[in-house]
Each structure stands twice: as structure tokens, then as C-alpha cells.
């Protein structure tokens, strides 16, 4: 049966109340709730809100294609024997979209105000930057001022350097 799921980009698990997103290769403890349909939405406390938010926030056709195209990442197999597939969490999705727009605005207007991203330890900043870099490299080629950007990630710990090398 595993070969039937080889091309399954996302996996959603739910008991009707709690609903989590991952991939078929994601360990259970790394499945994550999608808590907002759109950036800025308030968290709902209604029963079954997680399921409805997941359906609207991930599985609407436009959003699903966007996640499938730009927010699923396969880690370099040089570093791991097993194929590692990573799907964005909702904060990474919205942060990378906002950062991309901020950078585009900064470049086009020449304001020099591209923005700053602050995230707590363990929130997935490295993956957020990978998703952002992918957006800038693949989805901004039609913006002459951006073209083919050079992207430099500066880290302050060996652990982050090793994590970034896997990207």
C-alpha cells in the first residue's frame, strides 16, 4: 500500500474535533493544526473549527495548488537515508507570503525597507526562509528589478548552519 501514497502531497488526520496536516512521511508528532484560513483571522473556539479551518485554509482549490506548488519541500537525500518531505505550517505560509510582498515592494519602490522576520526558537524560521527563497527565485522572475536574486542566509549557530545545508 505505501506505493499508492507515493504521489500524495498532503495528509490530513482528524477525529472530527482535532485536525492536523502533514505528509505521508511526516511523523505523527510533527502533524500540525492549520489555525487560520487567512492571515489576520482570529482563532475560532467553536466546536469542529479546526476541521472547517483546515478545509477552507488548505483544501480550497487555489490554496491547495499554491501549497502543492510552493510549500512542499523534499530535503536533500545526501543528509538523510530516508526521503524527508516537509509541508509548511500556517505561520510559515503566511510569513513567507508577507515577506515576499514586502521585498517586492521594497525593490520596486527602492525604499530599502524589505522587512524583518522574528520568530521564537523552534518555530521553523529556517524553513520559512527556504519557502521565501523559493518564492523569490521561482515566482518573481517577471519582475525585472528582482530577476534572478542572490539569496544569502546568515545564521548565528552551527546547528542552524547544518540545518540550512540540508535545504
Model-derived regions, located:
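ATP-dependent helicase/translocase motor core
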Residues: 1-155, 159-167
Amino acid at each position: 500500500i505505501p506505493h499508492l501514497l507515493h504521489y500524495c502531497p498532503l495528509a490530513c488526520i482528524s477525529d472530527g474535533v482535532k485536525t492536523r496536516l502533514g505528509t505521508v512521511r511526516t511523523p505523527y508528532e510533527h502533524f500540525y493544526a492549520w489555525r487560520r484560513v487567512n492571515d489576520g483571522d482570529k482563532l475560532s473556539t467553536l466546536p469542529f473549527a479546526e476541521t472547517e479551518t483546515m478545509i477552507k485554509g488548505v483544501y480550497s482549490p487555489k490554496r491547495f495548488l499554491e501549497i502543492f506548488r510552493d510549500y512542499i519541500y523534499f530535503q536533500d537525500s545526501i543528509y538523510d537515508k530516508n526521503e524527508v518531505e516537509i509541508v509548511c505550517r500556517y505561520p510559515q505560509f503566511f510569513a513567507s507570503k508577507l515577506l515576499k510582498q514586502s521585498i517586492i515592494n521594497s525593490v520596486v519602490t527602492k525604499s530599502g525597507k524589505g522587512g524583518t522576520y522574528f520568530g521564537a526558537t523552534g518555530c521553523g524560521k529556517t524553513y520559512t526562509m527556504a519557502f521565501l527563497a523559493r518564492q523569490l527565485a521561482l515566482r518573481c522572475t517577471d519582475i525585472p528589478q528582482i530577476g534572478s536574486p542572490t539569496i544569502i542566509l546568515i545564521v548565528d549557530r552551527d546547528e542552524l548552519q547544518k540545518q540550512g545545508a540540508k535545504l
